[in-house]
Structures are given as structure tokens and as C-alpha cells.
UniProtKB/Swiss-Prot annotation:
Pfam families: Alpha-amylase, CBM53. Monomer. It comes from the Bacteria. Gene3D superfamilies: Glycosidases, Golgi alpha-mannosidase II, Immunoglobulins. Transmembrane segments: none annotated. Coiled coil: none annotated. Ca(2+) binds at residues 143, 184, 192, 226. One of its GO terms (molecular function) is starch binding. The gene is amyA. Binds 1 Ca(2+) ion per subunit. This is Alpha-amylase. It comes from Clostridium acetobutylicum (strain ATCC 824 / DSM 792 / JCM 1419 / IAM 19013 / LMG 5710 / NBRC 13948 / NRRL B-527 / VKM B-1787 / 2291 / W). GO terms for biological process: carbohydrate metabolic process.
Length: 760
């Protein structure tokens, strides 16, 4: 809540009952997004580990459940964090969009309100967000409580624990916004909490820790400027207070929380350097300058950061206050994208994308947050963490280049098409745009050249998750023993350019039985040969290239062709795999014949340990109609996570995805076929009880052991125990444990044995 919104907000309440771091700058091979609005794209992306290195989506007035539903798309769009609207109680259950301000007049300091959802809804959101590596930042209102239509009077709906008069300042409402004491000790249209009071601080600590314990990983403090400090302009003053030291210092998990405050800059009494000692701050002066620059078409004032340290601020084009008070509503979608491209490609700051509301409170807002240009900029920001910036204007100040270190650049052009010719530190090469505009730029001898289209956003950098894939083409992405694989190599950008001969140096399973094979020239620095996969291969075929003197070994990574599985997927099942290969370090083939099977292309989107190291792998359609892809399960994995995309649509198992345990050796529990609701599977057990038991009982259920059942297993000749079960409708997760005749249990050290079940 800002000063500039205060007077208008007060009238509404009565009516309703009331920095540029100079630096210059590996050429990458970007894949252009095809969809204008994306759910996921067919590229590898990985979110930053820390909130401070990523971008934040302000899911303004979205309900907790609507945010949870969109988490897969939010992660795919490159957002590391989601800011939720205030979670505290409200004095009315209205969900009318014009009553958005209700959330900024809290009746308590506890989680749950009629507009966004309950405590359990919030906790469930946080739990699911963790699976995607997404931080949940809560907008909290700690400066004041709800009024009854009269600014100084507490609303009747306010919780009884906040009706004690000693919890409030009684100094009236602020009229002199240039007086620091008035700004912090008087009201801003609502009853002003006595934040020097230990009782008020204790309540704040309890509430904020409730949020943290439920899974919140950060906070935005609304109206932080109106809560005094004991530094700067407040030091040794009668109104000085220790709210921030005591409250922030008492938070659980405090070292891992991302905290920022609304401290609107006025250049006089904002005392902003004091707040920077405790938290990050909104770059309010910069967002005004940026918005003005975008509206005028002269980007000169889009430079700088409004006098703030970019490493201590959250920057944006518009906030909810500015939108709701008509300061930014006139921005077009194109202007919003252009402003976002500048704000989010800057160094140091955490950019906040405000999602404009389109319906009642609780509804999801408009779709611009997942526009292909917005997503391209998000990914650029994530890839540029730690890189300095070099800003310059072009095209009569209608275009800006934000170059980040030596890794990449974003160009925002609000003017007509122009020919670019400017110094750069990017490496020589051709750079395709990651955004929606179809064009490319060339870097040669320290200069970037090309045509920049009118009203365009160009994003150039290297984000290829498989370095070297631009110069190697395989006839088979995975192969079985005895298969022939044709390898085509483009030496045009390598040390082997213009070589008179090129040999394929290849072997298997770490270059065992390595040998060289002469390749055939196709002209234009392209070479080709065909090999037959040996029967001795257990993991993969390895190869690199040489002319006898120079080498191309993919910067030490070499190239690999994984060994495909001999497993035959079961007809009629949407997902299948050989669960005996769920071993860290093994190749693992996933077969897919689900909702996207008739698409022209399907990619496997996968990660490990809760979606770490996410990447996409193109699948190949086999003669049985299944799409298949083979991955090497990382040695560090405990779980494998996956879903499927055709580049514009997703099959994520009705928002449940697929999650499988991985093992360090032969899995103790195997299933075949892969579990699917309403279908039969065979369960094989070879765990700690298997060898000595005279009988084994399978105890199983779905979705957290709902309606558990017991079934006797039958011992097989190979020592494993077998039971066949039919999964019920709605089953998306099969849960299992085992016990022997004496009642001894094997429940996987209280974790049970769990397999995702296809349920769509």
C-alpha cells in the first residue's frame, strides 16, 4: 500500500462501509518457442536454487488452489517464486474484484480467508510448490488492522485478540507525508498498530512463523515504510523502535527466507537505507521511471535503478496498487512485455511480474505471465545469475540493449525496424532469438550486427542443455545391441573445420574396445558414418571426432548413445517401463501412449529428487505406437519425476505427474506393467523379509493408503513373492508395505513403497 494510494483508498473505504555496472561480453544454440502462450515448451529449463537469483510471479488475488493447479506451468515459465496476496482474515467475504482492498485490511494475524482459501489450502500449496522448486512469498499486512469505515476505529470483525487499545497508536491519521514521525506513528487510513509494543511484536512473530512452518519461504511487508526503525532518520528519536530486529530475528528458517518491503521512495523521509539493513526493498522510483519510458517510447529513463543497490531490490513495471489506482492500466500488453523484458533482464534485482486480474477475487488473472516472450526473458534472467550488465540505447533511444557479461543480451525495440551495429563482448557466431520474433543476429570481431524488427523483443544467449547437439545428428537417439546408427557430424565451427579427413573415435561403456573409423565427406564440412551397436554394451556407446591431430570431444563431455531397453510395453497402457531398471546410474526407458500420443512430436520432461535438474528429451515413436525415450538415471537420485509435452500441451497425469523411487541396487519392489487406474498390475517383492518368510502379505492402498487391502503373495521360483492387484478408479499413487507370518513389517523405513499410477 503506497502513499500515493492512501487518499484514494481512504475514499474507497468510506464509500464501501466503510544501477548500471559497466562490462562487456559461449555462443549457444537457442530453440525458439513456437506457441504465443505457453504451458511448457520443449526445452530444458532449470530454476535457480535461490529466490534472489530468479523471477517472481505476483499471482494477485489468485486462490491458493488456483496457484497450486498452475504450478507446473509456473515452473515451466521460469518463475522461481510466487507472491500470494495477503493470507490474513478479512472483514467481508466479498469476492468482487473491486473489493481487492479487503485483503489489505486484515482482521487478524493468521492464515486463511474466504477469498483465497484455508490454512490447509495454503499448506498444500506450499508443499506442492516445493516439489517444483518454487518459493512461496506471502504478502503480509503488519502495520495496521481493518477499520469500520472510520479511519481510526477498529472494525467489529477484527479478532478479539486485536481489540485491546494498547495495541494501537492513537495519534490520528497522517496528513504530512514529509514528516518522518507522522509517517510512522500515525495512521494511513486504518487503525495503526503500536509496533514498538512487545505484545504486537509477539503476535507478529507467531503469525509469521505460522506461515514459515506451513511452507512459506519469503515475505513482502506491505506498508513497511510506515513501521519505524532505529536507524537513520529514526535513530535516537522518540518514535524509534526495534520491531524489525525482534520480529525478523525471531523467524524460523530465517537464513533461507527472501524478505522485502514496500518502502515507497520520496527522497525525504523514506529512510530507505535503514530498511535495506533489514530487507530488500521495492524499486518504486525505478518502476515509475520505467513505466514512463515505456509509455513515451524514449527509453533513456529506463536505465539506472532509482538510486537503489540493484542487489537489494525488487524491480517491476507495475504493482497491484498502481494498477488498481489507474496509474498503469493504460499500458498495452505489448508495453507490459517490453517493460518486463527490461526489468527482468537487469542484473542483481529480483523482478516481479504482476498478473492483472480478470475476474473475481480468487480467479486466475490474465495469461500474459506465460507469453512466449515473457518466458524467454524469464529464462534469460535465470541463466544470467551473477553476470554484470552493460546498458546502451539504440534507434534514437527507442531501443535498449541489456548485455549480461559475456553470456547474452536482450534487445527491446519500441521503434521502427533498424539495422544494428554495436560493440559487444559476445563470442563470434550466429544467435537466434529465443522470443517470438523470427530473426537472428551475428557477432563477429567484437561487433553485433543484424536487423532488429519494429516493436520486438530479442533474447540471445546459449541455453542448450546438450552442448554439441548442434553439430551431431543421430539416426537413433537410443539403440539396442545389433542396431545400426548413422552419425552425421558438422565440423564447420570446430577445430576440425576444413580437415581433409575426419575419424569417428568410438567405444562403449566408457570407451571400452575403443576404435577409430573413417568418416565419409558430405561436403561443406559435414561428415558421416554408420556403426553397429555391439552386443557387449550395457549402458551406452561413446564417441568423439579427430583428424589425427586435433580433436572435438564436446568440451570433454564426448557424445553418448544410450542403450535402449529390450522391454516390450504392454498394449492398452498409457505409460509403461521396466521397473527393474529403476537403479541409479542405469539407463531407463519410458514408453508413452497417452493423451498426446497422436501429436507430431512428444518430449519427456524429467528431473530427479523433486524436479531438480529438469530437462526435456525428444521421444521416438516405435512400431507399436508407443513413444519412447531412454535416460541415464543420475547416481545422486532418490526419486525420478516426469511428465510429457508436445511443446504446447501437457500430460502431467492430472497435475499429479509421475514419481518413482530409484535405488542403489536391484529394486526391492517391482511392478509390471506400470500402474494405471482400473487396470491390473503384478507386484514382485524381494525385500528384507523375502528369503526367510513362510508367507508374505501385501498391504496396499492408493493416494495415501485410502481403503487399504491385504492380499497374500505367492513365492516364485526365483525367490521373489508375487501378488496381482487391480487398481481402483482415481488411483494416482499406489502405496505398499509388506509383512511376514510373525507380523514383522517392511515399510521401507516408514516411507512405504510408492509408485505413481496413471490416472487420466
Amino acid at each position: 500500500m503506497s502513499k500515493r494510494s492512501k487518499l484514494l483508498k481512504r475514499r474507497m473505504l468510506s464509500l464501501s462501509v466503510i544501477c548500471v555496472l559497466i562490462g562487456y561480453g559461449p555462443v549457444f544454440n537457442p530453440v525458439r518457442s513456437q506457441a504465443k502462450v505457453m504451458t511448457y515448451s520443449s526445452e530444458n529449463r532449470e530454476l535457480p536454487e535461490n529466490t534472489k537469483d530468479g523471477v517472481m510471479l505476483h499471482a494477485f488475488d489468485w486462490s491458493f488452489n488456483n496457484i497450486k493447479k498452475e504450478l507446473p506451468s509456473i515452473a515451466a515459465a521460469g518463475y522461481k517464486a510466487v507472491q500470494v496476496s495477503p493470507v490474513q482474515g478479512t472483514k467481508s467475504n466479498s469476492t468482487n474484484s473491486s473489493d481487492w482492498w479487503l485483503l489489505y485490511q486484515p482482521t487478524n494475524q493468521a492464515i486463511g480467508n474466504a477469498q483465497l482459501g484455508s490454512y490447509d489450502d495454503f499448506k498444500s500449496l506450499c508443499s506442492e510448490a516445493k516439489n517444483y522448486g518454487i518459493s512461496i512469498v506471502v504478502d503480509v499486512v503488519m502495520n495496521h488492522m481493518a477499520n469500520n469505515g472510520n479511519d481510526d476505529e477498529v472494525a467489529s470483525e477484527v479478532d478479539p485478540s486485536f481489540k485491546d487499545p494498547s495495541l494501537y497508536h492513537h495519534n490520528g491519521q497522517c496528513t504530512d507525508w514529509n514528516n518522518r514521525q507522522d509517517v510512522t506513528q500515525e495512521g494511513i487510513g486504518m487503525p495503526d498498530l503500536n509496533t514498538q509494543s512487545s505484545a504486537v511484536q509477539s503476535k507478529a512473530i507467531t503469525f509469521l512463523n505460522q506461515c514459515v512452518d506451513a511452507g512459506a519461504t519469503g515475505f513482502r511487508f506491505d506498508a513497511a515504510k510506515h513501521i519505524e526503525t532505529d536507524l537513520g532518520l529514526d535513530a535516537n528519536k522518540s518514535w524509534s523502535g526495534n520491531y524489525w530486529e525482534n520480529v525478523l530475528g525471531s523467524l524460523h528458517n530465517k537464513s533461507n527466507l527472501y524478505i522485502y518491503g514496500e518502502v515507497l521512495q520520496d527522497g525525504k523521509v523514506d529512510n530507505i537505507s535503514a530498511y535495506e539493513s533489514f530487507m530488500n526493498v521495492e524499486a518504486s522510483a525505478y518502476d515509475g521511471s520505467l513505466r514512463g519510458a515505456i509509455k513515451s517510447g524514449d527509453l533513456t529513463n529506463a536505465q539506472g535503478m532509482g538510486g537503489l543497490d540493484s542487489n537489494k531490490c525488487v524491480d517491476m513495471l507495475e504493482t497491484h496498487d498502481e494498477y488498481e489506482h489507474n496509474e498503469s492500466k493504460d499500458l498495452t500488453d505489448w508495453q507490459r512485455k517490453a517493460g518486463w523484458a527490461i526489468a527482468a533482464s537487469r542484473a542483481g534485482s529480483v523482478p516481479l511480474f504482476f498478473d492483472r486480474p480478470t475476474g473475481n477475487i480468487g480467479s486466475e488473472g490474465d495469461a500474459l505471465w506465460k507469453d512466449s516472450d515473457v518466458v524467454a526473458v524469464n529464462e534469460f534472467h535465470n541463466a544470467m545469475a551473477g553476470q554484470n550488465e552493460y546498458l546502451r540505447l539504440q534507434n534514437n533511444n527507442k531501443a535498449m540493449i541489456i548485455e549480461r557479461g559475456s553470456k547474452g543480451a536482450v534487445i527491446v525495440n519500441e521503434g521502427d525496424s533498424f539495422n544494428l551495429n554495436t560493440p559487444t563482448n559476445l563470442e563470434d557466431g550466429n544467435y537466434d532469438n529465443h522470443g517470438s520474433a523470427t530473426d537472428s543476429l551475428t557477432v563477429s570481431q567484437g561487433r553485433m550486427t543484424g536487423t532488429v524488427p519494429a516493436n520486438s523483443i530479442i533474447v540471445i544467449y546459449n541455453k542448450n542443455s546438450n552442448p554439441g547437439s548442434d553439430r551431431v545428428t543421430l539416426s537413433e537417439q537410443a539403440a539396442k545391441a545389433g542396431d545400426s546408427v548413422t552419425i552425421t557430424y558438422d565440423a564447420g565451427t570446430t577445430a576440425l573445420k576444413d580437415a581433409s579427413n575426419v575419424n569417428l573415435y568410438w567405444g562403449y561403456d566408457g570407451f571400452s574396445a575403443a576404435t577409430s573409423k573413417a568418416m565419409t565427406s558430405l561436403g561443406d564440412n559435414k561428415w558421416q558414418t554408420t556403426i553397429t551397436v555391439p552386443k557387449e554394451v550395457t549402458k551406452n556407446v561413446n564417441f568423439s571426432f579427430t583428424d589425427g591431430t586435433s580433436w572435438d570431444n564436446n568440451n570433454g563431455a564426448n557424445w553418448n548413445i544410450p542403450l535402449a531397453s529390450n522391454y516390450l510395453p504392454h498394449a492398452g497402457y498409457k505409460v509403461d517401463y521396466d521397473s527393474s531398471n529403476l537403479v541409479s546410474g542405469n539407463n531407463f526407458t519410458i514408453y508413452y501412449n497417452g493423451n498426446l500420443a497422436n501429436s507430431s512430436n512428444v518430449s519427456l520432461h524429467w528431473g530427479v529428487n523433486g524436479w531438480s535438474n529438469m530437462q526435456n528429451l525428444a521421444m521416438v515413436k516405435d512400431s507399436n505406437g508407443f513413444w519412447e525415450a531412454t535416460i541415464a538415471i543420475p547416481a545422486s537420485s532418490n526419486t525420478l519425476n516426469f511428465c510429457f509435452t508436445n511443446g504446447s500441451s501437457w500430460d502431467n497425469n492430472n497435475n499429479n505427474n509421475w514419481t518413482l523411487n530409484t535405488w542403489s541396487s536391484v529394486p526391492k519392489v517391482q511392478v509390471t506393467p506400470a500402474p494405471e487406474a482400473c487396470k491390473q498390475i503384478s507386484v514382485y517383492y524381494n525385500g528384507s523379509l523375502a528369503s526367510s518368510a513362510s508367507n508374505i502379505t501385501l498391504h496396499w492402498g492408493c493416494n495415501g493408503f485410502t481403503s487399504p487391502q491385504d492380499i497374500n503373495m505367492v513365492k516364485q521360483a526365483d525367490g521373489r513373492w508375487l501378488a496381482n492387484i487391480t487398481l481402483p478408479s482415481g488411483c494416482y499413487n499406489v502405496n505398499m508395505a509388506f509383512k511376514d507370518q510373525s507380523g514383522t513389517w517392511d515399510n521401507n523405513n516408514s516411507n512405504n513403497y510408492n509408485f505413481s499410477s496413471t490416472n487420466n
